[in-house]
Amino acid sequence: ISNVTLDQYGKMLLGTNVQSAYTTISEMGIDIFGLNCSTGPIEMEPSVQWLNDQKHKPLLVVPNAGMPENEGGQAVYKMTPEKMASALDSFIKEYRQINIIGGCCGTNPEHIAQLRKVIDQQKKD
């Protein structure tokens, strides 16, 4: 498994875009390519869509609970468990290459519990 962290513009810290990172890393014998941390599902979606369209590797998607906001010098994540679960529900339905999904910064057990409900409901459907 290889993960990269992208900003809201789909770029890594030194400016590499997701397309270049994926093209390089996917040829190194990895089984799964992933995006984690740094952004929420909304900002991550264009990169997830592009990766899904490649249909070459299974995907790991682990966004934050939205973009962090600075409040008194502290990073605060305001995406509710329900809103995040709804966004990830759409990801699971639309992007079939996703094999691993979860939450990173700003998530808590309630975020994961709501995501679990979404996954369980999709299994029933």
Predicted regions and their residues:
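Domain-level signal for soluble alpha/beta catalytic cores
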Residues: 1-125
